[in-house]
C-alpha cells in the first residue's frame, strides 16, 4: 500500500513490543516517533487531507471509516486512493469526476452494491484498480472500464459477481493481471478475453465454473499463470488450452475431473507447474502431454483416487506429490528418468512393499515421504543411490524391524521420522537401536518411537532401553520331512530338534508282505540306507 503505510505498521508493531519488554531501550521507538511526527507535520502543512483519512504523503490517501457513505474529495496532487471498510454502497457517474489524475484506486471490504457504468469515465490515467470484498456486488455494467486503456492490474475478488458480459474487458488492451477469485461465476462467455493479449495472470478460482473451452481463452497469447481451482470443471479436451501456449502454471485443484484424455496438455510446452490436487482421477499418464518430453517441474496429484501411474517422459520434474491416493503397489521403473526429482511425497496411500530398485534413478532426491502407508519391510538397498537425502519419513507404517545397512548409504544425516510403527524390540532391532542412539538429534519425535512387542517392553520408547534388552527367544521350527524317489530308491530327509539319545522308527513294506519296522539309532541319523523296496513312512517318534 506504499511506504507510509509500512512506517505506520512498523511503528504500531514496535509500540506493542515495548509493552511486553519493560526494560528494553526505547531508542528505536523514539526514532520512529520522530519520523511519524515529521510525516504528520507534512500532512498538517498540506492541509488538504479528507476528514478521518490518512495522508502521510501528498500522493497517497487512505480512508477507513465504517460511517463513510460517500467518497471524500481529494487534492489534485493525490495519485493513490484506498477506501477500506466503509459503508460506501454506490459509485455514481460523478463520484470520481474531480480525480482524473489517479493512477491507483482500491475499494476493499466495503458495502458496494452497484457501480455506474460511467463511474470511472474520467480516470484515464488509472493503472491499478481493485474492487474486492463487496458481498452485495453481483454485476458490472458493460462500459464500466471503457476509458481504462492504461490499466495493467484489475482485481475483482470476493464479490458476488454472477456473470461477466461479453465485451466488458475489451478496452483493457494493456492489462497484465486480472483476478476474479471467489465470486459466483458459473459461465464464461466465449471470446471474453479476446483483446487481452498482454495478460500474464488470470485468476478464476473459487467460482462455480463448469466448463472451459478453447474459445474461453481465445486471445490470451501472453498468459503465463492460469488459476481455475475450486470450481466445478469435470471435463477438459485437447482443444481447451490451444490458445494458451505460453502457460507456465496451471492450477486445476479441487474440481471434479475424473479423466484426462491423451494430449490434453500437449499445447503447453512451457508448463512448469501443474496442480491437479483434489480431483477424481484414478489414473495419470505422461500421455496427457502427448508422450513428448516436457519442462514440467512441479506436479501435484494429491487427494485423487489414483491406482495407476506412468511418468516416464516427465524427466524435468523436481517436485512430485502423490499423497492421499489409493496406490497399493508401484512398478520398479515408475520413476525411471526422473533424475532431477528433489521431493517425492507418497504419504497416505496403501503401499505394502516397495521394489528394491524403485528409487535407483532418483539421484537428486532430497526428501521422500512414505508416511501412513502399510509398509511391513524395506530392502536394505532401497536407498543405496539416495546419498543426498535430507528428509525421510517412514512414520505410521507396519514396520517391525529395519534391515542391516538401510541407512548406511547417506552422505548427509537426513531428518527421519520413525514413530507410529509396531517395532518388535528383539535382537533383529539392534541395527535400528544403534543407529537411533547415534543419530538422535536427526530423528523427529524420537520419544514416540516405541516397542509393540514383546509384551515386557510394550510402549517402552526405543531410546529408553539398552541394547542388551533386545533379546531373541529362539523358537524351534516345526518338524519337517521330505521324501524323494529316484530309480527305485526312496530317500527320506527329516529335520527334528530333540535331545539325544534319539531313535527314529521307519516302517518299510514290500509288496504283498506285512509292514516291517526298523529302528535307526541317533548315532546313524545322518546315514542314509537304501533298499530296492516299495516303501512308506509309517511312523516317526
Predicted region positions:
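Extracellular leucine-rich repeat
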Residues: 2-4, 8-14, 18-541
Amino acid at each position: 500500500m506504499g511506504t507510509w503505510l509500512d512506517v505506520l505498521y512498523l511503528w504500531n508493531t514496535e509500540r506493542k513490543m515495548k509493552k511486553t519488554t519493560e526494560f528494553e531501550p526505547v531508542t528505536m521507538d523514539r526514532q520512529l516517533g520522530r519520523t511519524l511526527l515529521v510525516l504528520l507535520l507534512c500532512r498538517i502543512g498540506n492541509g488538504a487531507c479528507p476528514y478521518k483519512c490518512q495522508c502521510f504523503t501528498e500522493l497517497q490517501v487512505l480512508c477507513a471509516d465504517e460511517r463513510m457513505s460517500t467518497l471524500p474529495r481529494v487534492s489534485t496532487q493525490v495519485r493513490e486512493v484506498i477506501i477500506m471498510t466503509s459503508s460506501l454502497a454506490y459509485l455514481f457517474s460523478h463520484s470520481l469526476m474531480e480525480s482524473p489524475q489517479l493512477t491507483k484506486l482500491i475499494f476493499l471490504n466495503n458495502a458496494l452494491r452497484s457501480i455506474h457504468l460511467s463511474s470511472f469515465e474520467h480516470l484515464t490515467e488509472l493503472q491499478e484498480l481493485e474492487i474486492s470484498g463487496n458481498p452485495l456486488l453481483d454485476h458490472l455494467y458493460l462500459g464500466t472500464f471503457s476509458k481504462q486503456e492504461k490499466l495493467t492490474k484489475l482485481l475483482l475478488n470476493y464479490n458476488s459477481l454472477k456473470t461477466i458480459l461479453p465485451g466488458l474487458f475489451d478496452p483493457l488492451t494493456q492489462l497484465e493481471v486480472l483476478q476474479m477469485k471467489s465470486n459466483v461465476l458459473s459461465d464464461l462467455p466465449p471470446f471474453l478475453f479476446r483483446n487481452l493479449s498482454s495478460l500474464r495472470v488470470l485468476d478464476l478460482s473459487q467460482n462455480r465454473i463448469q466448463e472451459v473451452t478453447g474459445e474461453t481463452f481465445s486471445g490470451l497469447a501472453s498468459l503465463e499463470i492460469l488459476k481455475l481451482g475450486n470450481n466445478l470443471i469435470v471435463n477438459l479436451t485437447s482443444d481447451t488450452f490451444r490458445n494458451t501456449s505460453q502457460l507456465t502454471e496451471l492450477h486445476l485443484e479441487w474440481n471434479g475431473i475424473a479423466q484426462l484424455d491423451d494430449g490434453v496438455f500437449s499445447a503447453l510446452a512451457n508448463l512448469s507447474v501443474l496442480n491437479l490436487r483434489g480431483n477424481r482421477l484414478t489414473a495419470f499418464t505422461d500421455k496427457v502431454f502427448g508422450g513428448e518430453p516436457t519442462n514440467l517441474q512441479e506436479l501435484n496429484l494429491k487427494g485423487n483416487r489414483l491406482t495407476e501411474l506412468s511418468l516416464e517422459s516427465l524427466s524435468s520434474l523436481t517436485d512430485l506429490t502423490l499423497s492421499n491416493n489409493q496406490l497399493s503397489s508401484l512398478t520398479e521403473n515408475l520413476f525411471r528418468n526422473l533424475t532431477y526429482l528433489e521431493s517425492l511425497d507418497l504419504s497416505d496411500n496403501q503401499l505394502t512393499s516397495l521394489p528394491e530398485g524403485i528409487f535407483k534413478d532418483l539421484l537428486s532426491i532430497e526428501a521422500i515421504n512414505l508416511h501412513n502407508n502399510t509398509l511391513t519391510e524395506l530392502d536394505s538397498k532401497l536407498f543405496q543411490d539416495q546419498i543426498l537425502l535430507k528428509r525421510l519419513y517412514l512414520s505410521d507404517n507396519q514396520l517391525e524391524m529395519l534391515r542391516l545397512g538401510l541407512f548406511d548409504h547417506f552422505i548427509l544425516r537426513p531428518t527421519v521420522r520413525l514413530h507410529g510403527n509396531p517395532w518388535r524390540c528383539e535382537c533383529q532391532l539392534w541395527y535400528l537401536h544403534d543407529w537411533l542412539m547415534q543419530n538422535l538429534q536427526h530423528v523427529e519425535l524420537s520419544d514416540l518411537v516405541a516397542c509393540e512387542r514383546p509384551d515386557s517392553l510394550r510402549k517402552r520408547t526405543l531410546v529408553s532401553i539398552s541394547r542388551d534388552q533386545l533379546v531373541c527367544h529362539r523358537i524351534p521350527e516345526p518338524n519337517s520331512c521330505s521324501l524323494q524317489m529316484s530309480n527305485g530308491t526312496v530317500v527320506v530327509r527329516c529335520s527334528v530338534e530333540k535331545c539325544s539319545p534319539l531313535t527314529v522308527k521307519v516302517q518299510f513294506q514290500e509288496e504283498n508282505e506285512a509292514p516291517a519296522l526298523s529302528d535307526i539309532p541317533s548315532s546313524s541319523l545322518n546315514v542314509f540306507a537304501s533298499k530296492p523296496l516299495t516303501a512308506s513312512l509309517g511312523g516317526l517318534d
